[in-house]
C-alpha cells in the first residue's frame, strides 16, 4: 500500500496474525496539530479486501456528550424487576384525555420504567432483541394510586407520569394486582424526586443533542458544499435554532419548578383539603380516626345484614350490583351520613358486597402479613386441640384493631352459619368466600393453590371453633 506525499494524514496498516482472516485495521492520524485539537481520530475496519465500513461522522462534539455517558447508563443495562400479563388502558396522552380502551399487555418493569408489549411473551422478548421500541412509561416523578372510580372493573390502579400520560392497569386476581402495585410503587419511591433523575437527564440530553451536535454536523457538511453567499443564511438558522432551544429549556425549567413546589399529600391532608378515605386505608388508621378498634362501617353493615339478611339465600356468596356498591363506597369515603335502611340499599347483597370490598381493599389484610406463615403452620398441626390453641395464641398477639374486628366479623358469620338451612351458607362456603379476602401472603411465590387451601381452612376453623378461640360472643 502506497502513501500519498500530498496527504496530511498517514495510514498505519496492521495485518492480522491469524490465518484465514482478511481484517485490516487502519488508523487515520492528523499531522496538523491545530486541526487535531478540533477533530477526533476515527477507525475504519476492512472486513474484506476492498470493503471499507462507512466512517463515523467527524464533526466536533460538545462536552456534555462525554459527561452524560457517565450520568445515564444505557437502557440495555436496566434490570428487569417484574414481568407478566395485565389489562391496560391509556386514558390520557400529554394531559389530553383519551377514550378508555382495555387490552391485554405483556408488561415489563425495570428500575425506572415500564414497557408495554402487545405480543405474547416470546414475541415481546424477540422484539426486545431486534431493537423494537415498545410503548414505555418513565417512572421518574410518576404517581401511582388505586382508581376504583375510573372503571367498573375491580382491582384497578392508575399511573400518572410527569409528562401527563395516564395508564390504568387491572387484573381480576387480587394478589397479582397487589404484587404489581407494590412493585411499581417501590420502583417509583426509589427514584429521585428532583432534576437529578437519570430519566429526566436523558430527556435534556436528547434536546441538547438535537439542537447542538446534529445541527453542527449538518452545518459542517453543508458549509463545504454551498456557495459563500449562502453561509450567512446558515449562520442565521444556527443562531435561530439555538434561541429556540434556549426557550424550550426556559419553559422546561419553569414547569419543573412548578411541579416540585406542589404541596405534598401530607400538607393537603393537614389543611383538610384532602381527607383520608375509609376504603383503601390501613385498618389501624381508620380506627384511630374513629377512636375505636372496630370500624364504624363494618359495624353498620353487620347490623344491617343481621336485621334483614340472615335468611337470604346465598348471603355473602351472591354479588350485588357493582354500580350501587361503588355508590355506597363513594358516600362512605366522603363521610356523608349513611343510612343502610334507605330504599336505595334495599338489596342486601349490595351491603354484603361493600363489606367484602372494604376488607379486600385494605392495604394489609385483616390477618397481617407478618402473621401469615404462623397461621399456616398452626393450621398444619395434626391434633385438633393443638391446632385450636396455636390459632388462639396468634389471635391474642394481633394488634387490637385486627383482633377486635376479627372477633366481631367471625361472631357475625357464626350467625350466618346458624341459619344455613335457609341461606345455604355452610362453614365451608363462608371459608371459601372470606379466606382469600382476609388472609394472604405478602408475596406469592407460586404456591397460590396451596395457600388457598390453608386460607379456607383457617377461616373455617375460626368459625367452627369461634367460642374456643375468642371466648363467648358477649366477652
From Swiss-Prot:
Tissues/organs with expression: Expressed in lung, liver and lymphoid cells.
Domain PH: 79-189
Sequence ranges assigned to domain Rho-GAP in this UniProt record: 281-470
Compositional bias of kind Polar residues: 1-22
A GO MF term: GTPase activator activity
Primary localization class, coarse: cytoplasm
Record has Nucleotidyltransferase as a keyword: no
GO cellular component: cytoplasm; cytosol; nucleoplasm; plasma membrane
Membrane topology, from the record: Peripheral membrane protein
Record localization: Cytoplasm; Membrane
Annotated positions of the Phosphoserine modification: 43, 103, 196, 199, 243
Region (Disordered) residue spans: 1-23
Marked site positions, Arginine finger: 317
Keywords associated with the record: Cytoplasm, GTPase activation, Membrane, Phosphoprotein
GO biological process terms on file: regulation of cell shape; regulation of small GTPase mediated signal transduction; small GTPase-mediated signal transduction
Functional note: GTPase activator for the Rho-type GTPases by converting them to an inactive GDP-bound state. Has activity toward RAC1. Overexpression results in an increase in actin stress fibers and cell contraction.
Domain notes: The PH domain is required for localization to the membrane.
Protein name as annotated: Rho GTPase-activating protein 15
Species of origin: Homo sapiens
